């Protein structure tokens, strides 16, 4: 059953081939036997209660397509009464007193939450090695990273531990692990899904999204996650369409842009070949391919890491050992409490970004770093606007390589390069997807789809049509 999509599980539940309780027990058994370390918290008792409620709803004929579907929730979304750690020692004992808007919407649809997934601490990382709860393993090769920061969510879907999972994408944290684990990942337009109740890393970048087996599943889940929320000041009052309506539209005449900057040195040859084979598949469906340019995307890494680190420095200042979270037992006075609690509670990468952000915001450096980075951010956004006057969608790689070995990248700057193709999308606030398009070195390769603002329907349509013609999204890791 772990290979089934949302649509297939819905049919099975509707036909009474199995119950929600049986389905939930099946997934919980797989989680308990798994060696992926994909979960921080397994909510088995809660899941079985939710499954029984879903069974009762189905019996009364009041079920939707999502009723009783088991999912994994990234441990950055607040869940009332359930530990919400953000992968950090700082929040290891934090029990959220309220639900994030996304959590609330999923609960209202009578979905079954199997647990909270492992992640890079406060979503800062590209390998899921920065977690206080140890690294997640890639289901395709246990010696490889799953990607980050939503590595636990990606591994849970690829490894058959959940039907789908939630994620967040600040600089590629849905698309990159989706690519490295061979699943479908969607990061919507900034403001499309409420950020209320998501533990903040960089507020002008953070965006909730979805990790699924198929584009059709992603459309189904986006239907209930998207929408305006008065609790989130960055939430957009943009009408939410039915994202499943246009999935079967023809791609005849679709204009695809390939940014020349995405295919320079540094991109693995096998990865590039897989990307181009996928593009040729789209051409066979009637699409037209054009070379385009995003000249300022080469500045995406320094621009992102300056702005995001500044926002991180501000957001994480609330974690001081006083109100909630980790509190040092060795402190002698209030100042010492602040210093020791944060030094002991935060991991090395988080402390590095806090220091970078604090430095960039300090007197004498604000204009030289933060203000300049914001100006470059605008130039990057303008590049995309110009390109979208000529094309319908931009395509390219998600990651320059396939998944690398656990523990093999020690240099932070080298790690930051893993996000070279995804960061510009977050800087511009655009929607993006990753869909599986092949393998290199026996590891999955993802194709990145980048759309104009609010074009999630188009991206899902493009991905769905590709998945009707290919079977890369149906491939399953041998050990799973």
UniProtKB/Swiss-Prot annotation:
Active site, UniProt feature: 74 (charge relay system), 149 (charge relay system), 173 (acyl-ester intermediate)
Keywords recorded for this protein, A-Z: ATP-binding, Ligase, Nucleotide-binding, Protein biosynthesis
EC number: 6.3.5.7
InterPro entries assigned to the protein according to its UniProt record, in alphabetical order: Amidase, Amidase_CS, Amidase_dom, AS_sf, GatA
EC class name: ligase
Reactions catalysed according to its record: L-glutamyl-tRNA(Gln) + L-glutamine + ATP + H2O = L-glutaminyl-tRNA(Gln) + L-glutamate + ADP + phosphate + H(+)
Example GO BP: translation
Chain segments annotated as coiled-coil in the UniProt record: none
GO cellular component terms, A-Z: glutamyl-tRNA(Gln) amidotransferase complex
Domain of life: Bacteria
An MF annotation (GO) of this entry: ATP binding
A Pfam family matched in the record: Amidase
Subunit architecture: Heterotrimer of A, B and C subunits.
Alphabetical list of NCBIfam families matching this protein: gatA
Family: Belongs to the amidase family. GatA subfamily.
Record's protein name: Glutamyl-tRNA(Gln) amidotransferase subunit A
